[in-house]
């Protein structure tokens, strides 16, 4: 679950981390109230969206007067935000964050993230903060320090000394940095985060390290341990099909292809995506209905896939061990009978009640092509999608 910047800052503030004062507003009058309460004469207004690249795409506005602050907030609250990180979506800006300007001497990058390759958390730092870290990693890899962290949730003294040397911090600044890193680590572990990114962490002209921006992602599988974070979920920042899939309890990820997929089992689903690519096609989604989906869930899952107008072909790929093929067939029939238009459908059914399931589909008059192997199904689906 992604958090908005203000939500991440709310969490970090509880860990006594240095963050400039900020207010969150949903309307211009709320912005005006905040400005008057703080007596700010200048500041920054930041769109609260689940996307990076805000600074480059008009989502962050520096204002040098109260009037400019109000104008910036009014503009942001009435626009849709998109960048190369929004996957083609235009995200609504429902809230803005207002904060005073800070006199910056240096900008740094700091992040703690789960490294899936090494199966452990890593900490990454760079003296090139405030920019796209992907560009730094690609063009100047020597400017990025990356270290694995112990599973205890602590950081060793020698690692902190290495960080201070790499970042060229003198002792007073290093002392601040050490404290910030330790507190960030504590928050990362206690909140079951998969990402905690500070960009930028800045050194002010008076010698203080301050967190200006924060991005945080909480592991969905650990949310049951953090019921207080339930209200942080913002469905307006997601594809409507992703939101519906969550409500239905389906494992769904929207992709940019043209072949809609309904598969049972994550391994089989990923193999299906791979073989479609092998034959020159591309999937419109990842959808794993699991082994215990009901007829209703199958029906809703198919309707969900078909609601994507980019889908030209439906590929149903079921290996019925736990899953009953007759249940899949019944759900398919119900879903197709509710569709105004039909698209080419390729079906591979194997396993429990496969003959019964096929008979149900044939007797219902559902236009489709049955195949007997994954490769045959993938090749046919790709051909029909062209």
Swiss-Prot record:
Enzyme nomenclature, EC number: 6.2.1.5
Domain of life of the native organism: Bacteria
Pathway linked to the protein: Carbohydrate metabolism; tricarboxylic acid cycle; succinate from succinyl-CoA (ligase route): step 1/1
Entry annotated with the keyword Magnesium: yes
Name of this chain's protein: Succinate--CoA ligase [ADP-forming] subunit beta
GO terms, biological process: succinyl-CoA metabolic process; tricarboxylic acid cycle
One Pfam family recorded for the sequence: ATP-grasp_2
KW Transmembrane (keyword) present: no
Main function: Succinyl-CoA synthetase functions in the citric acid cycle (TCA), coupling the hydrolysis of succinyl-CoA to the synthesis of either ATP or GTP and thus represents the only step of substrate-level phosphorylation in the TCA. The beta subunit provides nucleotide specificity of the enzyme and binds the substrate succinate, while the binding sites for coenzyme A and phosphate are found in the alpha subunit.
Lineage: Bacteria, Pseudomonadati, Chlamydiota, Chlamydiia, Chlamydiales
A single GO cellular-component term on record: succinate-CoA ligase complex
EC supergroup of this enzyme: ligase
Xref: SUPFAM superfamilies: Glutathione synthetase ATP-binding domain-like (SSF56059), Succinyl-CoA synthetase domains (SSF52210)
Note describing how the cofactor binds: Binds 1 Mg(2+) ion per subunit.
Organism: Chlamydia trachomatis serovar D (strain ATCC VR-885 / DSM 19411 / UW-3/Cx)
């Amino acid at each position: 679950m992604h958090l908005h910047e203000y939500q991440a800052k709310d969490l970090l503030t509880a860990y006594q981390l240095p963050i400039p004062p900020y207010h969150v507003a949903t309307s211009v009058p709320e912005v005006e109230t905040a400005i008057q309460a703080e007596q700010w004469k200048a500041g920054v207004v930041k769109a609260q969206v689940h996307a990076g690249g805000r600074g480059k795409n008009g989502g962050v506005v520096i204002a040098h007067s109260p009037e400019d602050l109000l104008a910036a907030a009014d503009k942001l609250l009435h626009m849709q935000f998109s960048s190369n990180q929004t996957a083609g979506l235009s995200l609504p800006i429902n809230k803005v964050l207002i904060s005073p300007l800070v006199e910056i001497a240096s900008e740094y990058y700091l992040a703690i993230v789960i490294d899936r390759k090494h199966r452990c958390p890593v900490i990454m730092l760079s003296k090139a903060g405030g920019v796209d870290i992907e560009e730094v990693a690609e063009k100047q890899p020597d400017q990025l320090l990356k270290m694995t962290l112990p599973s205890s949730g602590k950081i060793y003294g020698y690692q902190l000394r290495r960080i201070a040397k790499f970042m060229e911090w003198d002792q007073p600044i290093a002392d601040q940095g050490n404290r910030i890193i330790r507190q960030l680590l504590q928050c990362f572990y206690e909140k079951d985060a998969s990402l905690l990114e500070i960009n930028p962490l800045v050194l002010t002209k008076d010698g203080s390290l301050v967190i200006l921006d924060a991005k945080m992602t909480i592991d969905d599988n650990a949310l049951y341990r953090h019921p207080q974070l339930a209200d942080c979920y913002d469905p307006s920042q997601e594809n409507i099909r992703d939101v519906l899939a969550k409500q239905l309890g389906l494992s769904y990820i929207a992709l940019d292809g043209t072949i809609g997929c309904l598969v049972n089992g994550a391994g089989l689903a990923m193999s299906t995506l791979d073989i479609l690519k092998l034959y020159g096609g591309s999937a419109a989604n990842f959808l794993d209905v699991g082994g215990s989906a009901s007829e209703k869930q199958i029906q809703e899952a198919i309707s969900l896939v078909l609601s994507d107008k980019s889908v030209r072909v439906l590929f149903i790929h079921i290996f019925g061990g736990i899953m009953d093929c007759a249940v899949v067939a019944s759900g398919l029939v119900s879903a197709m009978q509710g569709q105004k238009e039909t698209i080419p459908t390729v079906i591979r059914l194997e396993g429990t009640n496969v003959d019964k399931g096929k008979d149900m589909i044939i007797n219902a008059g559902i236009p489709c092509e049955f195949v007997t192997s994954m490769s045959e199904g993938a090749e046919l689906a790709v051909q029909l999608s062209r």
